[in-house]
Amino acid sequence: MEENRWFLNIIQDGFMNGKIDFDSTVKLLEKLHMPFNLAHVKHVFKKTVDKRKIHTINIEDFRAIYRAIVHRNEFHEIFCAYSENRKNLADTELTAFLKKEQFKTEGAETTALEVILKYEPIDEVRKRRQLSFEGFIRYMSSEDCTIFKKEHRTVYQDMNHPLCDYFISSSHNTYLVSDQLIGPSDLNGYISALLKGCRCLEIDCWDGSNNDPVVYHGHTLTSKITFCSVIHVVDKYAFAASDYPVVLSLENHCSTKQQERIAQYLLNILGDKLLTSPIGDIEVTQLPSPEALKFKILVKNKKCGTIEETMLRKGRDSHGETGEVSEEEITSSDEETDEKTPLYPKSGSSKRKSEGRSSPPPRKKAKVKKMKIAMGLSDLVIYTKSEKFVSFEHSLAHQKCYENNSIGELKAQKFVKHAANQFVSHTSRFITRIYPKGTRAGSSNYNPQEFWNVGCQMVALNFQTSGTPMELQNGKFLDNGGCGYILKPEFLRNRNSTFNPHNVGRYSNPLSLSIRLISGHQLPPSNLSKSNKADPLVQLEIYGVPEDQAKRKSSVIKSNALSPRWDETFSFTVQVPELALIRFCVQDEISLVANDFLGQYTLPLLSLSKGYCTVPLFSKSGGKLEPASLFVYVWYY
C-alpha cells in the first residue's frame, strides 16, 4: 500500500490528460531515479503499444514498463527470503542478510541503518527503520554492492617503499590518438592518460622550427604538437587523478640547442613540481618512495655522470654546456630498438624477416655510440636515468639504483621464457620499462600480464588502442584507489627471491574461487541486432601466471538482453592470486563461430568482494555502460 501510494505520488501528475507518449514516459522514469537504457525502454514501450495499435499508454501500462525495467525477479527472491511479511525488511532482517550473504561480520547493525537511511525512498518506511523492495533494489544496484572491494577504492597500500617496488601505470606514444604512421598527434592523448591515472608518459622530442621542439612520431606523417604545449598540459593535469609522482619519459632526438629549450620549458612551466635535486642525502643508495615524491614530476632521459656530480654543479650556469654519453650498441638481426617505425622500410633490412626465428642469430660486433646531451637537461634527470640494457649480469655488477632500462617486447618475451628468475631479480632492483615492438604500426598492444608476472614496473601500452590488453591495464590499476602505483607482491620485491612464473613452487598460495553467474541487466543491445534481441553469453577469464590462465563460458540465453538469467556456477583454483586478474566479458552469439562484444569488466582477483555483487560493464573504449551489469554471487577462501 505504501509503495503504491509513493509510486502514484511521483507519477500521477504526468497522467492528468489520461495517457502519455514515449517522451513523457522517459521523463517520468527519470523522476523515479533509477538508471535505464533508452533502447530497452523503447523496446518495452513498443511491445506495449503494439498490442493496441496506438502510441500512448495509461498509468497501468507505465507501472508495467517500470517493473519490467527496474523490478528484478532475482532481487525479489532474495528479498522474500529475508522478509517475513514479504513487503518490507525490518532492520534486524536486513542485518541478518548483511551478515549471512554479504559477510559484513563487523558493524552489520550500523551498516543496516546506514543502508535504510541512504536508499529507502519511502518516507514512512524509512522512519520505521525498514527497507521496502524499492529501497532494496536501489541498494543492490548501488556502488555499495559492486564487485570491486570498497576498501580498495582508496589508497590502502604502504606507499613508503622504493619506487622500484611498485607496478607503475605507463603509456607508450602518449601523444598519438590513432595509428603510428599518419595519425594525429594530440594533446588529448596526454590529458586522457593522466585522467586515467597514468603515471609515466612518453614524449617523443624532435627539432622544430624557430628553435621550438616538437612532439610527434619521427620519420612518419603523424602531425606535430609543440613540446611547450605538452608540458602545459602536464602541468595542468598531472595530479588531477592521483597525488603520486609522474615520470616524463623523453624519447630525445633533439639537437643540444633544442635540448636546452626543453630544459627551460620544464623548469619555467612546471616550477616547484619538477624534481631538480635528490630528496635527503646526495649519495643515492635507494630510490625514494611514491609518498616522498608526492606531487613531483620526474624527467626520464639520458644523463651525463652521476647525481653526485650533478649536485656539485648546482647553482652554476650550465647554459650552452654539453656532455657526451657513450654506450655500446650490440646488435643482432632480431635486436629491437626504441626507434620509431619509419614510413618506408629501408631496403635490404633483415630486421622484419628475422623476428620469427626460433633461435637468435649470432651477436654482431659491439659499436660504441656517442650522444651529445645538453647539461641543462642532463641535470634535470635525478632518479630516472635511462641506461641501455646490456645483460642481467652487467646490471647487477654496474647499474646504480636510479638507472632504468627500457627493453623491447620481443627481447623481454625471450627473457620471460628463458631467464625468468634473472628477470625477477633484475626488476627487484631496477625500474624496467617494456615497450611495444616497432612493427606495431597500427598501435596494437601486447599482453602486459607476462611482464607483470616478472615484476616489470613500467609496462607501457598504447592507451589509445582499445582491446583486452588495455582492459587488463585498466582493471589492474583500479586497485589502490586508481593512484597509478600498485605495491608488487613480496616475492617480486625481495632481492633473494627465486620466484619463477613458469614454476611457482613454494610461492604458491592457492585460492579457491566460486562465482555464481545469476543474471544480466539491461545489457547493451548488439550492434548487429535490429530487434534489440541479443543472445548473450558470459565468458569468465583468469589472467596471471601461466598455470592460472583459465577461461569458462556460460550458456547462451536466446533473445534477451534486458534480463537474461543463467544461474550457473564457475569454480577456479588460483595458485598465485597476488598476480591474477579476472575478466567478465559479455558477448552476443551471432553464429556458432562468431560473437559480438557487448561489454566487459576486469579487476584484480584480490579486489573481489564476497556475496551478492553487481558487475558494471564497460565498452571497448573504456566508457561505463550504465546501467548494464551482471549479477553474481562470489565466494573464495
UniProtKB/Swiss-Prot annotation:
It catalyses: a 1,2-diacyl-sn-glycero-3-phospho-(1D-myo-inositol-4,5-bisphosphate) + H2O = 1D-myo-inositol 1,4,5-trisphosphate + a 1,2-diacyl-sn-glycerol + H(+). It comes from the Eukaryota. One of its GO terms (cellular component) is nucleus. Its main location: nucleus. Residues 310-369 are annotated as: Disordered. One of its GO terms (molecular function) is phosphatidylinositol-5-phosphate binding. It holds the Pfam family C2. The keyword Hydrolase applies. Interacts via its C2 domain with PtdIns(3)P and, to a lesser extent, PtdIns(5)P in vitro. This is 1-phosphatidylinositol 4,5-bisphosphate phosphodiesterase zeta-1. It comes from Gallus gallus (Chicken).
